[in-house]
Amino acid sequence: MTKPFSIAIHGGAGTILREQMSDELRQSILADLEAAVKAGHQILEQGGEALDAVVAAVKVLEDSPNFNAGKGSVLTHNEMVEMDASVMDGRNLAAGAVAGVRHIKNPIELARDVMLRSNHVLLVGEGAEKFAFEQGHQYTEQDYFFTDRRYEQLLSMREKGLFALSESRYPDDRKHGTVGAVALDQQGNLAAATSTGGVTNKQYGRVGDSALIGCGTVAENGVVAVSTTGVGEFFIRKRVAEDVAARMRYLQEDVHTACEAIIQGDLKTMGGEGGLIAIDANGELHFAMNSTGMYRAGINTRGELRVKIYAND
């Protein structure tokens, strides 16, 4: 008898307002979300590991210009792309992360390599890239990541003297762009992965929660796997991912109760906006957000696919 397995993904909690979303863009986003969750689910269905499933799912999102990670990463104040990513394996609490990488096509794969092929958890900037090239990752020119849409967003914020956490005429990209995945495999192992380009017009060197284990990413067998998206500074201060795990571990709360207590309670009280995806040891999925929406998809233990954008979908 096949043991339960499931997967959930997100493409960021800062969704484009309904009135600004063209049918063409909506269909493109939904197609990318479906492709990503199916890529991960296929691995689980074949008996593969949760870690490989979440990396495969996130890689699909990194390769799309629709999301703020990899190809679609936003630009820093000095017109560069600087990306963060992390992974965690619930089996042994192994983790790997990178921050401030500029020339790596798929930072999530590099984060996994840091976990599996180094003695460290977090590598940053030039050191992370040196390690990447030693491991066989290809040098990717900044031109690959450049898109007109991201450049226009940067110019808009510059012209108005706004920085990353301010309002802009691109409300979907104010502060929430991140992608992530969580999964439970047939062996009962949990894993989580998160990747981002950060925030538009960020000061060079800024690192958000996506690179920090316990803030943007956490996974622990028998408890939960979490990937977050939102205003990174708040998620770091609140240690959101680990807070969810702690409530489930020590208070014995279910995944729904723990997630909502943090996202709708503590985080919101602090002024933090965003969301998260989580999966418990039984494969129960939960999507929590206090924003207008969150690009998301999941395939539950019954094999049912759901792909959604807005909070009230």
Predicted regions and their residues:
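Alpha/propeptide regions of enzymes that mature by internal proteolysis
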Residues: 1-313
